[in-house]
Swiss-Prot record:
The keyword Amino-acid biosynthesis does not apply. The active site is at H188 (tele-ump-histidine intermediate). The gene is GAL7. Binds 1 zinc ion per subunit. Zinc binding seems to play a structural role. This is Galactose-1-phosphate uridylyltransferase. One of its GO terms (cellular component) is cytoplasm. It comes from Cryptococcus neoformans var. neoformans serotype D (strain JEC21 / ATCC MYA-565). It is an enzyme of class 2 (transferase).
Length: 381
């Protein structure tokens, strides 16, 4: 629901005015942070930096790509001639299974110089053998295979971490496009397993628990999803299996999307029914196709899955709720991006276009209007 207030025109008449027409702040209950919304700035001229627009990849197999089947990676290893998804250990991991502890395994008692050794593993998951086939262009069955891969890695890595420690997290994510620091255009994502729960998911779960404790155990994201489905003004697309994609009320990025269940509590992707998983594959394709169609370009983004940090031992009592965050940088066109700088680094996030307007534009960006890559041909490198 969009808040309104009244405005006097000088007489005794008061007319309702939407807060979307004025500068205001919105609160993000997931992270306990605010975002400053400045609708009038959408009209300002732009003479700043412009990016080189991304060009669609049209080569099914690139002999120089480190991720294509049969190719040699920088380590000298050769990829197998894989036909579906392909998972392997990251050649340049940010975490190590057994890092050398510096000084002591204990956290320092000094509040100003605290540190602790951590361990973990980093994996790469290639979504498809074809170099040119993004998730938006895949068949639903192929996206389902990606989801199966995520489930397998989450379960396997989670089991290893649970055997080693009582704490930890398996974080699944994808960076798409050079603008988001992606070094290879081949469709792929990453899985980082950590011996700790990172700040973002940890904060979300803390706020889920706090919300539930004051509301007879109800779940924040499920309550929020149901209200968004009822209001519809920020809904981008919805699937009858129980998934809804919205530009969240508190979105910081211009065309940010939050994808979540709206019918029941689902702590992790391991608890999805077959119908829910196919529905998730369908709505993922829908969302990513709308992104590509918005500015008629391969749309850059960072996408991540938040769920129970490790596979839940008791799903019924788990506080997490599975959901996907999409953070795309583009602001006005394929060449103009948003920069999180200045006030946003030193104060709080700020946006120009209101989330409701962003949702309208994404709803109008019909996924079937833009021709996808020809993915009906068999893969033959």
């Amino acid at each position: 629901m969009t808040a309104t207030h009244t405005h006097s025109n000088g007489s005794n008449d008061f007319t309702p005015v939407s807060i979307n027409d004025h500068v205001h702040r919105r609160f993000n209950p997931l992270l306990g942070k605010h975002v400053l919304v400045s609708p009038h700035r959408s009209l300002r001229p732009w003479n700043g930096q412009k990016e080189t627009p991304a060009i669609p990849v049209e080569t099914p197999h690139d002999s120089k790509c480190y991720l294509c089947p049969g190719n040699k990676r920088t380590t000298g290893q050769h990829n197998p001639d894989y036909k579906g998804i392909y998972v392997f250990e990251n050649d340049f991991p940010a975490l190590l299974p057994d890092p050398l502890a510096v000084g002591t395994n204990k956290i320092s008692d000094d509040p100003l110089f605290q540190s602790e050794p951590v361990r973990g593993r980093c994996k790469v998951i290639c979504f498809h053998p074809r170099h040119d086939l993004t998730m938006a262009a895949m068949r639903i069955s192929e996206i389902n295979h990606v989801l199966d891969g995520w489930k397998d890695v989450y379960a396997e890595e989670g089991k290893i971490m649970q055997e080693e420690s009582s704490d930890g997290c398996v974080q699944i994510f994808e960076n798409r496009g050079a603008m988001m620091g992606c070094s290879a255009p081949h469709p792929h994502g990453q899985v980082w397993t950590t011996s700790f729960v990172p700040d973002e998911p940890a904060t979300e779960i803390e706020n889920f628990v706090r919300y539930a404790s004051g509301r007879s155990g109800s779940h924040m994201l499920l309550d929020y999803a149901l209200r968004e489905v009822k209001a519809r003004e920020r809904v981008v697309t919805l699937h009858e299996s129980g998934w809804v994609a919205v530009v969240p009320y508190w979105a910081a990025w211009p065309f940010e999307i939050l994808l979540m269940p709206y019918k029941r509590h689902i702590p992790s992707i391991l608890q999805l029914t077959a119908e829910e998983q196919t529905g998730l594959a369908t709505i993922l394709k829908d969302v990513l196709s709308r992104y590509d169609n918005l500015f008629s370009c391969p749309f850059p983004y960072s996408m991540g899955l938040h769920q129970s940090p490790l596979p839940p031992t008791d799903p019924t009592s788990n506080s997490a709720q599975v959901h996907f965050h999409f953070y795309p940088p583009l602001l006005r066109s394929a060449t103009v991006r948003k920069f999180m700088v200045g006030f946003e680094l030193l104060g709080e996030a700020q946006r120009d276009i209101v989330p409701e307007q962003a949702a309208v534009r994404l709803r109008e960006s019909l996924p079937h209007k833009r021709a996808t890559l020809s993915n009906d041909k068999p893969y033959n490198p």
